[in-house]
Amino acid sequence: MKAPVRVAVTGAAGQIGYALLFRIASGEMLGKDQPVILQLLELPIEKAQAALKGVMMELEDCAFPLLAGMVGTDDAEVAFKDVDIALLVGSRPRGPGMERKDLLLANAEIFTAQGAALNKVAKRDVKVLVVGNPANTNAYIAMKSAPDLDPKNFTAMLRLDHNRALSQLSAKLGKPVAGIEKLAVWGNHSPTMYPDYRFATADGASVGDAINDQEWNASTFIPTVGKRGAAIIEARGLSSAASAANAAIDHIRDWVLGTNGKWVTMGVPSDGSYGIPEGVMFGFPVTTENGKYTIVKDLPIDDFSQKYIDKTLAELEEERSGVAHLLG
């Protein structure tokens, strides 16, 4: 049996955490031969800690063969001690009357502290995925707060947008999602992100040629993917939790186990590709191998695409400048 991998999950008793933990413990994220130790963080509030205890009792009651141990805590340094993987799910949700700016600042405090704790106690090659919104900027803050860790250790989740776009294309084409490749999603995990099927193929044939409808792309596809989260809240009365958990599992599994040359979307610190300033946490098409991701390079960007990329970049730059004073 392999040595267990230590996986930290923050916001562990929340909706996404509840949809996530049982799938990690069953081996869906890292493989059916990989034991895990779950290190679970919740708020230092009696109700949250009680809920966490209940979730841990349920995890015990599943008797997962791969669950080699659990820690539940309200201390980030305990949760992140020696972790190989950290899923930062917990974040401050937007309350009534809260401006986006207030939300940014409330979360900046959380992710500054979590970045510093990871910097202090996590494994040096820890893989960090930020799920809590605003995910790109929260990931940027955590990265900047962990100066001793490689910036490449930090990623933001755009896989939910990627999966949403895949499913819309599948429905439009009447083809299974498994056959659709080379989809890209650019930018921020927000309604400004740009799902781009110009390079995509379905069963080897060009998706763009098959759809051949720029009006559908601009007025149906892009806004449907961008506003899908809001549509789910409208329908369910709660935000998308199971699909977000599923995307987090996809993201980590592909990062750790590799994509075999297939493109996926990850929010990663830019290396200057496509004119995105270095260090901006931006959604790019990537491939992964041996636990490392590589941005897909040299794709032609047409005027239509550039306009969307500029817009989502402007939003990220604005978020970044809104928290700059906190990062020294």
Curated annotation (Swiss-Prot):
* Residues forming the catalytic site: 189
Question: What's its catalytic activity?
Answer: (S)-malate + NAD(+) = oxaloacetate + NADH + H(+)
Give, as one word, the top-level EC class: oxidoreductase
Q: List its EC numbers.
A: 1.1.1.37
Question: Per UniProt, which keywords does this protein have?
Answer: NAD, Oxidoreductase, Tricarboxylic acid cycle
Cite a single GO BP annotation.
tricarboxylic acid cycle
Residues annotated as binding NAD(+) are 11-17, 107, 114, 131-133
Annotated SUPFAM superfamilies:
LDH C-terminal domain-like, NAD(P)-binding Rossmann-fold domains
Q: Which residues participate in substrate binding? A: 94, 100, 133, 164
Show the InterPro entries listed in the entry. Answer: L-lactate/malate_DH, Lactate/malate_DH_C, Lactate/malate_DH_N, Lactate_DH/Glyco_Ohase_4_C, Malate_DH_type2, NAD(P)-bd_dom_sf
- UniProt GO molecular function: L-malate dehydrogenase (NAD+) activity
Q: What does this protein do?
A: Catalyzes the reversible oxidation of malate to oxaloacetate.
Tell me its family. Answer: Belongs to the LDH/MDH superfamily. MDH type 2 family.
Q: What is this protein called?
A: Malate dehydrogenase
